[in-house]
């Protein structure tokens, strides 16, 4: 058998297994190669109708009619793959699939109903249906199925257990009783309302009469007040008009006085202007005479001054020229000297630079030598430490001996005590002498020995340090030791 091209319809998928496919391949169209198997499965939802028998927490049975629209989840590849593996080998309308879905729904419904009382189920029907829907969906997820719609009908009594019918009768009777109560309350409200309306009518009539009297008196008072206000406004208007007339007369008098003052000022200004003009003309005449006299004097003395000025200018220019030439020569000489000093400084700088580079090179080589010496010493110490079995104390002693540290310490100590004249005293408490064998033994003998050692000890301390013992301990006389006991 050769290659075959397979195409699925709009509500179908192809499940391909076999050669070259690790698990299951889902596709809408594909080439089927030899060694492969292609299976079609429909993903359209199916309606499942059930009447689930459950029991509440009080052990009361009931029937839950339900219609579930269930199908594979087309927008999730994982769900489709699970459906293709678990459900697609069977017809979706087969008894096997029907029993599977029914078992899931009945199981979740019974578990949920067993945790609730009948009153809770009856009062919270909507929440109960939602809980059934959510729990069933969780179980169907493992088969790749999704609930498209769930229509849970009204709860029904089981034959011989009429709990819901009794609850309905109870509700109906409560509604009838509530209706009677509502009718009685409405009749009571009507009678009470009629009496209240009659009383309110009388109260409103009396209130209107009182308000009418008050309004009449109030309007009369307002009329009197308005009349007095109008009279006052008329009087104020007359006073304002009289004040405006007086103000106009005062303004007219002030304007007349101002006009007279301006006329007098104009006459005075005219007279002063004539006098000022006469003085200005006289000043012009005097200025003209002075200018003519100045020109005459300039003509007499200016020619001589001009000649003297030109001669002095020529002399100043010649002297300036000589000074400029001398300054230029001096500047040229200073520039040459500066160039010579610059060249000398460059040569000295070059020489110092070479010396610095040579010194830097020498320091670098010296540092490299120190580094090499340090590396060699490090290798030497590591080898010695290994030869001595890792004993740092033995390595230290060897290094001190090889470097002459002990010899140097001995030399320093010898230099420190050179020139000193130490006094060495040796004494004995005479415990081994025959003359003292007869003395008391034990503790008293030891105490006697200590007291005998004190005099020579104090004498030696005095000879070497010059210090005397305290008076309570003993005294030294004539260089001979003495003690008190």
Swiss-Prot record:
Q: How is it modified after translation?
A: May be palmitoylated.
Residues carrying the lipid (S-palmitoyl cysteine) are 38
Keyword Hydrolase included in the entry's annotation: no
- Tell me where it resides: Cell membrane; Membrane, Caveola
List GO terms (cellular component aspect). Answer: caveola; plasma membrane; plasma membrane raft
Q: Which UniProt keywords apply?
A: Cell membrane, Coiled coil, Lipoprotein, Membrane, Palmitate
Q: What is its main location?
A: membrane
Instruction: Kindly list any coiled-coil regions of this protein.
Output: 228-320
Q: Which cysteines are joined by disulfide bonds?
A: none
The record ties this protein, via Pfam families, to: Band_7
Q: How does it sit in the membrane?
A: Lipid-anchor
Q: Which family does it belong to?
A: Belongs to the band 7/mec-2 family. Flotillin subfamily.
Q: Which PANTHER family is this protein grouped with? A: FLOTILLIN-LIKE PROTEIN 1-RELATED, FLOTILLIN-RELATED
Function according to Swiss-Prot or TrEMBL: May act as a scaffolding protein within caveolar membranes, functionally participating in formation of caveolae or caveolae-like vesicles.
Tell me the protein's name: Flotillin-like protein 1
- Organism name: Oryza sativa subsp. japonica
